[in-house]
């Protein structure tokens, strides 16, 4: 599998000039970051907007969040300098399990070290510094992207002016960890897994496909599956329509994603806890930036109680809602509603800034 085929031609690359130390104690050398930008950085370097992508996403935010960014949109490329980088550990251009290990000359594979959400954010910060960005007007992202958003607020308060964590939590729940582990076990059970030391020609495709089927079931909702499929039967495939749908999405992921990468990133998500041994409420209360926390009423993966908790504990937070039957994936589907939430939030920030200046 050549994952370069799924990276746009507009993608740029930054090569970290120094070794990158991981939170767990490991060190990566020759780290590469794949990223995209839209708009222009102003002379003050303070019009940055950072998009953080989810589990199987890439730096090509104009493809998976097309309605949210562009000229005169919520993330306005006429006004903002918008950045989206492929996260550490992914397979779309940034150093990860499919990358060549400079110490061995072969892909890392199963030897790629454990990483955390903080590691992802710290590497993004190195890119932001390289690009000459002095201030990020907004850091925004959903799901795994939302976890990065929260860590950005905590790690770099001097850079981040506002945040929008969407359909996410401050720490991964037992529910999410359990679902992730079941997906990983599906991959491990594939005969081609071989402890993660599989070949490019014979990856654990069936295991990864089943993992994706499990994930898709959690990304949607009872309402959406019932309304779309009910008990429809696919006579050609001789199975229920919902089975055909899930199998289709499983096979789609196999064509574009790597199993070791899936393991690495889901384990990083499971490690997510903004407190890390500190008092959870106090850590969230230390976030000083204005925050738009977005909840999805039908999300069974990161239920609204988790976003309500964030909005309750972050001092300057407001809770926005996506009323949708699409479940967790609504933040990638109901773009019109999400766009309006972001537009309203950014307008409120402008009004607040004007008020602060004139009073």
Curated annotation (Swiss-Prot):
Name the lineage: Bacteria, Bacillati, Cyanobacteriota, Cyanophyceae, Nostocales
User: Where, by residue number, does substrate bind?
Assistant: 212, 329
Protein name in the entry: Homoserine O-acetyltransferase
Which GO terms fall under molecular function for this chain's record? homoserine O-acetyltransferase activity
NCBIfam families noted in UniProt: homoserO_Ac_trn, PRK00175.1
Any transmembrane segments, and where?
A: none
Q: Name one GO biological process term.
A: homoserine metabolic process
InterPro entries xref list: AB_hydrolase_1, AB_hydrolase_fold, HAT_MetX-like
Annotated organism of origin? Trichormus variabilis (strain ATCC 29413 / PCC 7937)
């Amino acid at each position: 599998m050549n994952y370069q085929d799924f990276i746009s031609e507009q993608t740029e690359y930054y090569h970290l000039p120094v070794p990158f130390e991981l939170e767990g104690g490991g060190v990566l050398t020759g780290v590469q970051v794949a990223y995209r930008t839209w708009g222009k950085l102003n002379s003050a370097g303070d019009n940055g907007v950072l998009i953080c992508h989810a589990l199987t996403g890439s730096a090509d935010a104009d493809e998976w969040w097309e309605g949210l960014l562009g000229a005169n949109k919520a993330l306005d490329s006429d006004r903002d300098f918008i950045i989206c980088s492929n996260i550490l550990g992914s397979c779309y251009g940034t150093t990860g399990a499919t990358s060549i290990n400079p110490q061995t000359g072969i892909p890392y594979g199963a030897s790629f070290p454990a990483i955390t959400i903080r590691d992802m954010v710290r590497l993004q910060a190195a890119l932001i510094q390289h690009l000459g960005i002095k201030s990020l007007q907004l850091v925004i992202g959903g799901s795994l992207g939302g976890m990065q958003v929260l860590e950005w607020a905590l790690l770099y308060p001097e850079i981040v002016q506002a945040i929008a964590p969407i359909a996410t939590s401050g720490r991964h729940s037992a529910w999410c960890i359990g679902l992730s582990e079941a997906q990983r076990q599906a991959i491990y059970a594939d005969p081609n897994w071989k402890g993660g030391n599989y070949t490019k020609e014979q990856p654990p495709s069936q295991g990864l496909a089943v993992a994706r089927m499990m994930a898709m079931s959690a990304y949607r909702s009872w309402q959406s599956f019932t309304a779309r499929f009910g008990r429809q039967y696919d006579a050609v495939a001789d199975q229920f329509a919902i089975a055909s749908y899930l199998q289709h999405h499983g096979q789609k992921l196999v064509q574009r994603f790597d199993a070791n990468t899936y393991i690495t990133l889901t384990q990083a998500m499971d490690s997510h806890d903004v407190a890390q041994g500190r008092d959870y409420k106090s850590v969230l209360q230390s976030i000083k930036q204005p925050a738009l926390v977005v909840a999805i009423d039908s999300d069974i993966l990161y239920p609204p109680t988790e976003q309500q908790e964030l909005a309750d504990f972050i001092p300057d937070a407001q809770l926005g809602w996506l009323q949708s039957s699409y479940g967790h994936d609504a933040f990638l589907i109901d773009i019109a509603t999400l766009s309006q939430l972001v537009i309203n939030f950014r307008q409120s920030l402008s009004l607040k800034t004007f008020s602060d200046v004139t009073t």
